[in-house]
């Protein structure tokens, strides 16, 4: 049976590592940048899953958690990307 969401082993491991990072008096630049997105745990859970499985297809639950967090925290507005049709993510949001 596949674990989902915040009960996945990767999420639990990422949460423990995040607690350690928060206690670090001198976090590295990467940890700081990811923390500012509000999705540090979800990002790390996705990375841990891929590192262990070597297959993104086995990380759909972690990917869904990360995407949900990313959108919930307004990170699409932080990063402008170009979609296949040539519009930016900001253009897509204006159409909604």
From Swiss-Prot:
Gene Ontology biological process: mitochondrial cytochrome c oxidase assembly; mitochondrial respiratory chain complex assembly
Span of domain CHCH: 36-77
Membrane topology: Peripheral membrane protein
Keyword field: Disulfide bond, Membrane, Mitochondrion, Mitochondrion inner membrane, Repeat
A Gene Ontology cellular-component term: mitochondrial intermembrane space
Motif window: Cx9C motif 1: 39-49
InterPro entries: CHCH (IPR010625), Coa4-like (IPR039870)
Intrachain disulfide bonds: 39-69, 49-59
One Pfam family, short name: CHCH
Subcellular location: Mitochondrion inner membrane; Mitochondrion intermembrane space
Residue positions of motif Cx9C motif 2: 59-69
PANTHER family reported in the protein's UniProt record: CYTOCHROME C OXIDASE ASSEMBLY FACTOR 4 HOMOLOG, MITOCHONDRIAL
Family: Belongs to the COA4 family.
Record's comment describing the protein's domains: The twin Cx9C motifs are involved in the recognition by the mitochondrial MIA40-ERV1 disulfide relay system and the subsequent transfer of disulfide bonds by dithiol/disulfide exchange reactions to the newly imported protein.
Its job: Involved in cytochrome c oxidase assembly or stability.
Note: Present with 907 molecules/cell in log phase SD medium.
Protein name: Cytochrome oxidase assembly factor 4
Organism, as annotated: Saccharomyces cerevisiae (strain ATCC 204508 / S288c)
Name of the gene this protein is made from: COA4
